[in-house]
Regions:
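A generic "folded-domain core" signal
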Residues: 1-137
Length: 137
């Protein structure tokens, strides 16, 4: 591991995925599905949460993240990526992820397929703190 890395991140793959179309479960081909937190001090990025759903999101759609009884919206989407609209929303999401046990992430593909991905949050706080420490923030 580098002593002074320019980027640090944590990443998790889902423990469970589900896709539905017209209310019916369907099998779909998706590329990597991941939930990220990125630290890039030179760009003033500190714990930016993002999600890649493994498919291009429907234009104008948002991605919803449910942690316990907290709901968060990733309103910024670009291709297969989604993230919170601003620092405040990102910080609120991080607080929920630190307190939670699992996160459910809901999205809609450009073909109209709805997805639900389940991520374990066990170890999230420790991993986030380690990434933060390594990137000197």
């Amino acid at each position: 591991m580098e002593n002074n890395p320019s980027q640090c991140w944590i990443v998790s793959a889902p423990s469970k995925t589900k896709a539905t179309r017209n209310g019916k479960t369907v099998d779909v081909k998706r590329s990597e599905i991941q939930l990220f937190a990125l630290f890039e001090p030179a760009q003033k990025v500190y714990g930016q949460i993002s999600f890649t759903g493994g498919y291009p999101f429907k234009q104008g759609s948002t991605v919803r993240v449910s942690v316990g009884d907290s709901e968060h919206i990733l309103s910024q989407t670009d291709g297969e990526w989604a993230w919170p609209k601003d620092i405040k929303k990102n910080e609120e999401l991080i607080k929920s992820l630190k307190r939670g046990v699992k996160a459910l992430v809901f999205g809609t593909s450009k073909k109209g397929t709805r997805t639900q991905d389940t991520f374990s949050l066990l170890g999230f706080s420790a991993a986030l703190e380690e990434a933060q420490k390594r990137c000197g923030t």
